[in-house]
Structure formats: structure tokens, C-alpha cells
Regions:
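Residue-level recognition of pore/gate-forming positions within transmembrane alpha-helices
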Residues: 28-32, 118-119, 155, 184-188, ...
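Aromatic- and glycine-rich beta-strand/loop motifs that create alpha-glucan
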Residues: 1-25
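Secretory targeting signals
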Residues: 32-37, 57-71, 113-174, 225
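Hydrophobic alpha-helical transmembrane segments of multi-pass membrane transport/permease proteins
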Residues: 19-43, 74-80, 187-189
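Long, hydrophobic alpha-helical segments
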Residues: 65-91, 126
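Hydrophobic/aromatic residues in alpha-helical transmembrane segments
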Residues: 81-85, 133, 164-165, 243-244
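Helix-loop-helix units of permease transmembrane domains in multi-pass membrane transporters
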Residues: 88-118
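Terminal transmembrane helical anchor/hairpin motif
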Residues: 39-63, 179-247, 252-255
Length: 255
């Protein structure tokens, strides 16, 4: 485990040694804050309108602001993941340092886990920017905490799944641009699968719908944890990292 920790720390340090980590955090914080501001403004406006018109009970902050906002955050990850993972292995291969890793006394699994965990920690740092903004909502409106925590669990699992896919693609090329572009295409495809099967109930449509990352995050966004969603995310993480290990083994033999 010490080797995994050292590789993870090295990977995380490399992110923060360049502008990429700060740019991604700033980009995410800016977009999230802008969407939150507009959602909160609309919520307050509609609340006043309902009071003046003698409407029903109070509007739900969870339903009207937080759930749609975290759903939007799920969409932003499609753009963040390729930028995080495109350099994981591609840069090592381009610079020739991958040979040093492969000939060092560490296993392929330790290398892959260390790099994936480093990417995950950066993703969590980016995600933490949203928690700072949401803290203001909790100070102001007292929303229900449990659905928010479940939604964040879904975001973390979805992020881990997509980062695993990105790591796999990065291990197959030495060009960061190609790695980032292919990763974006793949995660976008997984995101769009549920839309393509919306009006179809056939077996193939059910399979494609199950493979869609949106389908599995929807339950988390509603505050619901289902076993099938956990199995999907953990299976995708395991599968992508396993295939990455096969790619690394091939590189080791060539090295």
C-alpha cells in the first residue's frame, strides 16, 4: 500500500504543480456558482409569487434547487474527466518515464491504483468547490441533508467510473489530445445511451439503458441508493482498471 500511496501523492502533486488543477477548480466553481445563483434567484421569485397569490405550501429547496443543480454537476463531469485523465499514462509514455515505472519494484496494479486514486483526489477537490456554495443554502434554508449526501455519493461513484475509463484510454496512447478526445467521446456516448432508448422497451434498449451513466445517477440524485446502481459503478471501475492492467502488462513485456 505504501507504493500506491507514493504514486498517488506524486500524481496529485503533478496536478497542482501545473495550472491544470487550479484552472479546473476555478472553472467548476465559476459555473456551479453561476447556476446556483440563478436557481436561487428563481426560487425566491417563485416563492414570493406563490405567497402573494395565496398558493400552496412552501417550495422544497431540495426539489427546486439542489437536485437539479447536482444533476447539472453530473453533466459537468463529462468535461472534467477527460481533462483530468488525458495525461495519466499518455504523458508518461510521451516523456519516456513509463519505462522507469515499469522497471521499478512496483506492480502494474499498484501503478494503476496510485494514478487512479490521484485523479480521484483531484476530482474530490473540484467537487468540494460545490460543497462550499451549498453550505450557504444550508445556512439559509435548512434543506434535507440525506438526499444531498446520497447525491454526492452518486457523483463520487460516477466520477470514479469515468476516471477509470479515462485511465484505460490514456494507457493506450502517448498523445494527450487523443486520450482526452476519445475519453470525452466515450463518456458522452455512455451519457447519451438513455436518451436513445427513451421510447423503446426492447431487450437491446434495456441493455443500453443499463449501460447509461445517467440512468444510474438518477436514483442517487433523488436520494435513493439501489444495489443495482452500486453494482454498476463498482463493476465499471473494476473492469476499466482490470483492462488497464492488461494494457500495462503488454507495455511491460515490450519494455
Amino acid at each position: 500500500m505504501r507504493s500506491v500511496f507514493l504514486i498517488c501523492r506524486k500524481e496529485l502533486n503533478s496536478y497542482f504543480a501545473s495550472p491544470i488543477a487550479y484552472l479546473l477548480m476555478a472553472f467548476f466553481a465559476l459555473i456551479f456558482g453561476f447556476v446556483l445563483f440563478n436557481a436561487t434567484r428563481d426560487f425566491i421569485r417563485y416563492s414570493f409569487q406563490m405567497q402573494f397569490q395565496g398558493g400552496g405550501g412552501p417550495m422544497s429547496i431540495n426539489d427546486q434547487i439542489i437536485t437539479p443543480l447536482l444533476g447539472f454537476t453530473s453533466t459537468i463531469t463529462l468535461f472534467l474527466v477527460p481533462l483530468i485523465t488525458m495525461r495519466l499514462f499518455a504523458e508518461e509514455k510521451r516523456s519516456g518515464t513509463i519505462e522507469l515505472l515499469l522497471t521499478s519494484p512496483v506492480t502494474d496494479l499498484q501503478i494503476i491504483l496510485g494514478k487512479w486514486l490521484g485523479a480521484m483526489l483531484l476530482f474530490l477537490c473540484i467537487l468540494a468547490m460545490s460543497m462550499i456554495n451549498l453550505a450557504l443554502l444550508f445556512a439559509w434554508g435548512k434543506p434535507d441533508l440525506k438526499p444531498v449526501l446520497v447525491a454526492y455519493l452518486g457523483l463520487i461513484l460516477q466520477g470514479g467510473c469515468l476516471l477509470g475509463i479515462g485511465a484505460l484510454i490514456s494507457s493506450m496512447t502517448k498523445n494527450q489530445i487523443i486520450a482526452g478526445g476519445v475519453t470525452f467521446f466515450v463518456v458522452l456516448l455512455l451519457w447519451l445511451l438513455s436518451w436513445s432508448t427513451a421510447n423503446d422497451t426492447g431487450v437491446l434498449s434495456q441493455v443500453l439503458n443499463y449501460l447509461s451513466i445517467v440512468t444510474h445517477f438518477d436514483n442517487f440524485a433523488k436520494g435513493v441508493v439501489e444495489t443495482k446502481d452500486l453494482v454498476f459503478y463498482f463493476s465499471m471501475i473494476f473492469f476499466s482498471l482490470f483492462i488497464t492492467s492488461r494494457a500495462m502488462e503488454s507495455l511491460r513485456w515490450r519494455a
